[in-house]
Amino acid sequence: MLNYLKKKNIKIGVLGGTFDPAHKGHLVISRIAKKKIKLNYIIWSITRKNPFKKRPKIAVVERIKISKKITKKDRFIKIEFLEHKINSKKTIDLIRFLKKINTTLDIFFIMGADNLIKFHKWNRWKEIVKLAKILVFDRQGYKSKSLNSIAAKKMHKDRWKFIKLKKVNISSSQTRKI
């Protein structure tokens, strides 16, 4: 498990979330991140529950199955549930865990613009930025607020990048309604 991370000097993206359920938007940003940043792999780190959101509607085992199914053709995307391994659901602990596996990993933590707005409230967010570069994907209705957020103003410009998207405005909550 995670042997793909043991190669020297590889670039990985980490997209964390509940994936309730995984959808086309997750795939699109993963593909764009891979292409723009030349990532070797992207880990979809599935969490049991997001501390900033309501309880997931779909059980974690089912969310993992759905994620594996929709990423079948995208072999660079690795579906992982690591909370039990690292004994934590915090992003900082996940990043530290990955760095322990391979200190040469170049990690890019991927988030939507909506998450950047509250990023300064995340546990040890400044340390996350030291250990991983941040890729922020535009989300309709969040651009201005995210670019003016506390975290956006405090992060050094070399540690994060804002990526504009052509319209792919679909969220997990919209997917559940379909």
Residue ranges and their predicted role:
Residues 1-178:
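Nucleotidyltransferase catalytic core that binds NTPs
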